[in-house]
């Protein structure tokens, strides 16, 4: 369905997709994946009620720009985008295994990169 194109869905693992696509954990604890009952799961880095948007979707980007334009036209002084570093996800193509939580945790984050800290 077109509305699903706005979010990050993946097929579950296991015979019938009963297992989440990866072992990723939510910032709030528990799995970062929520099942929808058809073998598919959606990603939420925070609460299940806050599904992550797919910023590769032209509709998501257009809606975001429309929202910014709406408020800019009303004279707001600026915008605060919470957790901006976590908006876009560079996921591998569907069918490619996702990295494990341990592999993700080993990556530099929060602006701490060995090259930049020299």
What are the language-model segments listed below?
Residues 1-118:
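Alpha-amylase-like alpha-glycosidases and glucanotransferases acting on alpha-linked glucans and related
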């Amino acid at each position: 369905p077109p509305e699903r194109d706005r979010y990050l869905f993946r097929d579950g693992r296991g015979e019938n997709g009963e297992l989440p696509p990866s072992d990723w954990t939510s910032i709030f604890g528990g799995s970062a994946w929520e099942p929808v009952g058809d073998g598919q799961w959606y990603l939420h880095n925070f609460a299940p009620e806050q599904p992550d948007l797919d910023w590769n979707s032209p509709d998501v980007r257009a809606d975001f720009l429309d929202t910014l334009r709406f408020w800019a036209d009303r004279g707001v002084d600026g915008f605060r985008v919470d957790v901006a570093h976590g908006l876009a996800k560079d996921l591998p193509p569907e069918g490619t295994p996702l990295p494990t939580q341990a592999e993700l945790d080993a990556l530099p984050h929060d602006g701490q990169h060995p090259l930049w800290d020299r």
